[in-house]
C-alpha cells in the first residue's frame, strides 16, 4: 500500500474521533507538535523507527514525553500507531490530518516559496491571490528557496503555479535547444 494511503487512513480515523469529541483544533495541534518533536529529534527517531525496539518500550517513551502535552485520545492513537508498527508514518498522518481539518474549515493548504524573504504586506497579497485561485480560504506556509532566482512558486494541493525565473530560464533553454537540434 502506498505511504500516502496508509497515512490518510490513519488520519481519517483520528479525524472521526476528533469530530466526535469536538476537539478538531486541539488534536490537530497536538499531532502536529508530536510530529515536529519526532522529526526534529534524531535520537527519538532512532528509537521509534528501530525495528528491534519493542512496541511497549516505544509506547512508554511516547507516554513519558507527551502525557502532559496531549490528550488521552491522541496518546492512545499514537499507541495504536506503534502497535501496528506504523511509527514512521506519524509525520504523514499529521499532514493528512491537517488536510482533513482544513477541508472541514473550508480552507486549503498552500505552500508559497519565494527566492527571497518577503514582508507581511507581500505575504498578504500572495494569500489573496492564492485564495482567489483556489476558490477557498488559504492556509499558507511560506518558504525561501534562493535557487528560484526570483519570482514565486505556489502549491495548492496537486496544483503548482510556477512563476519563478528559474523555470522561465529552463523553458527558454529548452526551446533554444530544440530549435538548434
From Swiss-Prot:
Disulphide bridges: none
Pfam families: OSCP (PF00213)
Membrane topology value: Peripheral membrane protein
Main location: membrane
Subcellular location: Cell membrane
Single GO molecular function: proton-transporting ATP synthase activity, rotational mechanism
Entry keyword annotation includes Metal-binding: no
Keywords: ATP synthesis, Cell membrane, CF(1), Hydrogen ion transport, Ion transport, Membrane, Transport
Record bears the keyword Membrane: yes
InterPro entries: ATP_synth_OSCP/delta_N_sf (IPR026015), ATPase_OSCP/dsu (IPR000711)
GO CC aspect terms: plasma membrane; proton-transporting ATP synthase complex
Highest taxon, organism lineage: Bacteria
Entry's family note: Belongs to the ATPase delta chain family.
Function: F(1)F(0) ATP synthase produces ATP from ADP in the presence of a proton or sodium gradient. F-type ATPases consist of two structural domains, F(1) containing the extramembraneous catalytic core and F(0) containing the membrane proton channel, linked together by a central stalk and a peripheral stalk. During catalysis, ATP synthesis in the catalytic domain of F(1) is coupled via a rotary mechanism of the central stalk subunits to proton translocation.
Self-association state and partner proteins as the record states: F-type ATPases have 2 components, F(1) - the catalytic core - and F(0) - the membrane proton channel. F(1) has five subunits: alpha(3), beta(3), gamma(1), delta(1), epsilon(1). F(0) has three main subunits: a(1), b(2) and c(10-14). The alpha and beta chains form an alternating ring which encloses part of the gamma chain. F(1) is attached to F(0) by a central stalk formed by the gamma and epsilon chains, while a peripheral stalk is formed by the delta and b chains.
Full protein name: ATP synthase subunit delta
Native organism: Desulforamulus reducens (strain ATCC BAA-1160 / DSM 100696 / MI-1)
